[in-house]
Each structure stands twice: as C-alpha cells, then as structure tokens.
Amino acid sequence: MENLTVETQNLTSLDNGSIEEKNGPTVDEVQEWLISYLSQLLDLEIEEISTSTSFNRYGLDSSASISLTSDFGDWISKEIDPTILYSYPTIEAMAEHFGA
C-alpha cells in the first residue's frame, strides 16, 4: 500500500451535486462508494469486497484509513475523523451511519 492515491473522480457515477441536493447519500450510494474506493486502493475486484468484512481485515494501516476518511469526507462534504472506522468498522456499518 505504498501509493495511496485513489482516483476519487472515477469511483462511481455519483457526484457531490446529487448528494447535496438530497441531503446526503443513500445507504446504497455509501456502500458503492466505499466498495469502489477499497477496490482501487487495494487493487481488488469489486466482487472481492464484502460489506461485512472489517476494514482491518483488508489490511488498512493508519495512513490508508486517513486517506479513506478524508476522501469520503470530501465526497459527502463533511469532515470525518479517521477514528470513525473504529466505531463503524465495516462498509455496512459506515453506510448505515452515513447513509440517508
């Protein structure tokens, strides 16, 4: 995980404008974004990402966690503390927390 650059503009067809218009992303949109992000970050196929597997099991170190939460926060236009991954340790949990 040396290169933590993820092309967030290419993650999905979702964009900030549509999120802001409806007061935040849906649970499904959050899951789709996180799956796409991890797929790119970890060089895995989307099918290899499980919404119920903990971020720790994917081997995210602190640097990757900071990148993920920063990029996710940019996507939803909110500042996200990287320690949120301890409270919501799976894609499913994050989606339930942040999804509308």
UniProtKB/Swiss-Prot annotation:
One of its GO terms (biological process) is fatty acid metabolic process. The keyword Transit peptide does not apply. Residues 1-25 are annotated as: Disordered. Transmembrane segments: none annotated. It holds the Pfam family PP-binding. The modification O-(pantetheine 4'-phosphoryl)serine is found at residue 62. This is Acyl carrier protein JamC. It comes from Moorena producens (strain JHB). The gene is jamC.
